[in-house]
Amino acid sequence: MSAETPFLDTPLLLYLLSADSGKADVAEELLRKGGIISVQVLSEFTSVCSRKLKMSYGEIREILTTINMVLDVRDLKPTIHETALDIAERYGYSFYDSMILAAAINAGCSLVHTEDFHSGQHIQDCLLIVNPF
């Protein structure tokens, strides 16, 4: 994957299940184009689906199977954890949000699609945050 391949944050995957058709359509289009996510994104998605959306693990597993076929899922490594500490300290994001940003940098992405961070902000001079909505 190249720097042009975006990293996708958890809410984008959750919008696939949203009643907000506008956001669901945007999320579907982004997934269709491909992207990179981390295991953290899968974990957050699973947690929200089971706890807030009351989905069964069978239903969740079915969706995750499709996500795993469409997106490049990256493992988390100690170096990502270390980078996340730096990002949290420098930019003031929560540690778990910083893990998303660090995973994107580690994957070589130059772009992260999310609505949870400051759109237009550059992180460590190599990652641009973009709100696709």
Spans of model-derived segments:
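Acidic, PIN/NYN-like endoribonuclease modules and their adjacent C-terminal/linker elements
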Residues: M1-S2, A102-F133
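Histidine- and aromatic-rich ligand-binding microenvironments
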Residues: L8-D9, S38-V39, Y93-S94, D116, ...
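Alpha-helix capping/helix-boundary segments
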Residues: L12-L13, V41, I80, I100, ...
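Short, conserved active-site loops that position catalytic residues or coordinate cofactors/metal ions
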Residues: V39-S47
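Active-site neighborhoods of divalent-metal-dependent phosphate/nucleic-acid chemistry enzymes
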Residues: D72-E115
